[in-house]
A protein has these predicted regions:
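Short basic helix-loop element that most often maps to the first helix and adjoining turn
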Residues: 15-34, 59
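A short, Lys/Arg-rich alpha-helix, primarily the initiator
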Residues: 1-23
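Short, charged recognition helix plus adjacent turn
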Residues: 1-7, 70-77
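Key DNA-contact positions within bacterial/archaeal DNA-binding proteins
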Residues: 29, 40, 69
Length: 77
């Protein structure tokens, strides 16, 4: 059995981030510009090609305009 670093909870985490981005009517390009990263950065974490660390998550939450603590509470619910 192969182990994956991408658990069901991590998949939910990325799906919630995508939903938050879409709720704020931000495209991947617009978010990438706010992050000062290429669009492929956003695409890769949204598609599970790369994993985010906590600092990256906090930067993304800031740029999307969401409260990181509230987001984590929703993820834990």
């Amino acid at each position: 059995m192969t182990k994956s670093v991408f658990t069901d909870r991590y998949h939910l985490f990325t799906q919630m981030l995508i939903q938050e981005r879409c709720d704020k009517e931000l495209t991947q390009v617009q978010l990438a510009e706010k992050l000062q990263k290429p669009q492929s950065y956003v695409s890769k974490y949204e598609n599970g090609e790369r994993r985010l660390d906590i600092v990256e998550f906090l930067e993304i939450a800031d740029c999307i305009g969401i409260d990181a603590a509230e987001f984590i509470k929703k993820l834990q619910a």
